[in-house]
């Protein structure tokens, strides 16, 4: 949903909105996710002097992942919408459809069909990127596997984590 909203901002006829959203997308896609996690986690403290609570690390991970992946999804959605030929819009107008009806009944179903492979790839990448959450002290599966492996001097926790990531991405 956030990616679609950003997509509409990127496609806006208003140059100010389009420029701001384009800059946001460029920053999110042009900087590492790990850096974004650190900025979202440490930013409130260093910029505003707000104390970081114990539960904030998970919230920071959700915020950073949401704003990062929304930019990627926005570009996927934009590519899908712009790939629909002008004839589709013209046909809907001739049939008397409103702009909303045109989008939801004609354009969106075609867009979904076209973008589904790209969206699936991004979701797989998102699942794998969750291992970066350790940067802000969120114990996710890879961090726990690393702790167990170092305590037991065995590779099995890494193998189990790899199998889990692989199986989860098959779904």
Label the model's feature ranges.
Residues 1-171:
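Transmembrane alpha-helices and adjacent helix-loop boundaries
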